[in-house]
Design a protein with these regions (language model features):
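Catalytic phosphate/metal-binding cores of nucleic-acid and nucleotide-processing enzymes, i.e., regions
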Residues: 1-138
């Protein structure tokens, strides 16, 4: 034969059983974008912004050697940060619905610190949950 049957079988895409449908997964960044845009219009929100937590090494002048490790902010920082019209801090960690309860210990500690200081903090998987956090209902 021209092609090995075992290799041909391995190269074929995996097929689903008839009648099954793959559940769509909405990326967290899309949920963040929707919440961010909607909260920007909320009457109690003075300012809200997305926080980028980045980490990496600075390269030396030769482009190869790493001179030092840099982090843009500390571990556990929330996804959305801002403040209300009356000056209270807003800290919202955005999660996909299926990973709602999967906070890192650092994220949980940050949310707890904001709450202890009198801020509004919580985990949101949609705009309604984020609005409830801002309005103090959660």
């Amino acid at each position: 034969p021209l092609f090995d049957p075992d290799q041909m079988a391995a190269a074929q895409p995996k097929r689903r059983r008839a009648g099954t449908v793959k559940k769509p997964v909405i990326p967290e960044r899309d949920i963040q974008r929707v919440i961010l845009q909607a909260l920007a219009l909320h009457p109690l929100v003075e300012r809200i912004e997305r926080i980028n937590v980045m980490a990496g090494r600075l390269l030396g002048k030769d482009g190869v050697s790493a001179s030092r490790f840099m982090r843009s902010c500390r571990k556990g920082r929330v996804d959305l940060d801002g403040f209300t019209t009356d000056g209270r801090v807003i800290a919202i960690e955005v999660k996909r619905p299926e990973t709602r309860n999967k906070l890192t210990p650092e994220q949980q500690e940050y949310l707890d610190q904001v709450r202890r200081a009198g801020g509004l903090a919580g985990v949101a998987t949609c705009y309604d949950e984020a609005a409830a956090i801002v309005e103090g209902r959660i």
